């Protein structure tokens, strides 16, 4: 028996082609796309303007991504963290963060991660599989329906390396930004990468108006290779060349993520090396005190030293901010909730 496919993953163009093969008129595709990506239905029977015969055929061949909220944690500031169970039983994490300008969702792009960053809970059990475009969309739709408010911004900074799931992430971006769907503008989307250089170049060629956020976390190869195995394949100087190419090709600024680890990458010397590395790029640095991760030797830099590091960067001409810690009482490290579920602690 043929496996059902996720209709939520199809772009409008792909959906049009599928329906044409079924002998359906072109306008049906836009109607179906509206039902899935604008009205956010999760059952074909809810599509009241569609012929019953067509709905029966769709039901046989497709499913609509609709994860189950396995666990929900809400902080006093309104931050909500979800453990979502996908159709195949695998779990991922999604977070809603509330700001003065709107609601931001942090989405996962893979079940697990194979990048091996040593301060991250998401990667400790490796990668199980990639998420499909429609599954990533469904994280946003599930969160939006749960909080009853529009999601206006997206950060691809949850479980997984987005550029390691390039094709599905590109389809997700096309669907989520479509005027026929929830229409979240590319300028309201940030995509984070640990530094897969060939994929950064491939992304540059798309000339999307999103913000690229580079998970740098160290200013030199000695420290970065100790924290992030990806640096062995794409060392700092190679990564920075790719980032500059990206800027030249797209005309978009980039930001750098820098997780502060006590005694590892938080010295004045590191601040100077970091400033030397990115000065003149017009880039922004987000300083992030790491969350503790079971089994990791790393601990977070204390607040006073994070502030000192920030001031050092700014004195050297680099714009840096300390990331606001939303939902501190539920701010378990990214991937920790999923890991606890896998270990039977949830």
What are these regions (language model features)?
Residues 124-153:
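Conserved alpha-helical substructure of the radical SAM core
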Residues 98-135:
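Canonical Radical SAM [4Fe-4S] cluster-binding loop centered on the CxxxCxxC motif
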Residues 88-102:
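P-loop NTP-binding catalytic core
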């Amino acid at each position: 028996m043929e496996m059902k496919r996720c209709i939520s993953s199809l772009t409008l163009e792909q959906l049009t082609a599928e329906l044409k093969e079924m002998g359906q008129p072109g306008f049906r595709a836009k109607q179906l796309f509206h039902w899935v990506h604008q009205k956010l239905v999760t059952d074909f029977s809810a599509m009241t303007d569609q012929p019953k015969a067509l709905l029966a055929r769709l039901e046989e061949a497709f499913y609509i991504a609709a994860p189950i909220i396995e666990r929900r944690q809400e902080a006093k500031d309104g931050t909500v963290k979800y453990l979502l169970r996908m159709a195949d039983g695998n779990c991922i994490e999604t977070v809603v963060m509330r700001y003065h300008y709107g609601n931001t969702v942090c989405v996962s792009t893979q079940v697990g991660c194979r990048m091996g960053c040593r301060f991250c809970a998401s990667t400790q059990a490796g990668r199980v599989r990639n998420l499909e475009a429609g599954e990533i969309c469904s994280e946003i739709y599930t969160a939006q329906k749960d909080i009853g408010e529009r999601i206006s911004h997206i950060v691809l900074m949850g479980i997984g390396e987005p550029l390691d799931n390039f094709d599905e992430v590109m389809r997700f971006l096309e669907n989520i930004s479509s005027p026929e769907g929830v229409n979240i503008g590319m300028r309201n989307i940030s995509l984070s990468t640990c530094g897969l250089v060939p994929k950064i170049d491939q992304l540059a060629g798309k000339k999307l108006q999103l913000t690229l956020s580079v998970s740098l976390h160290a200013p030199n190869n000695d420290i970065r290779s100790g924290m992030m195995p990806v640096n062995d394949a794409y060392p700092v100087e190679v990564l920075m060349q790719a980032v500059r190419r990206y800027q030249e090709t797209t005309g978009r600024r980039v930001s750098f993520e820098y997780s502060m680890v006590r005694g590892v990458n938080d010295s004045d010397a590191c601040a100077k090396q970091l400033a030397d590395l990115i000065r003149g790029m017009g880039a922004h640095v987000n300083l992030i005190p790491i969350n503790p991760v079971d089994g990791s030797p790393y601990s977070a830099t204390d607040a006073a030293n994070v502030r000192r590091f920030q001031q050092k960067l700014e004195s050297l001409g680099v714009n840096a901010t300390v990331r606001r810690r939303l939902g501190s009482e539920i701010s378990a490290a990214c991937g920790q909730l999923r890991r606890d579920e896998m270990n039977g602690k949830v």
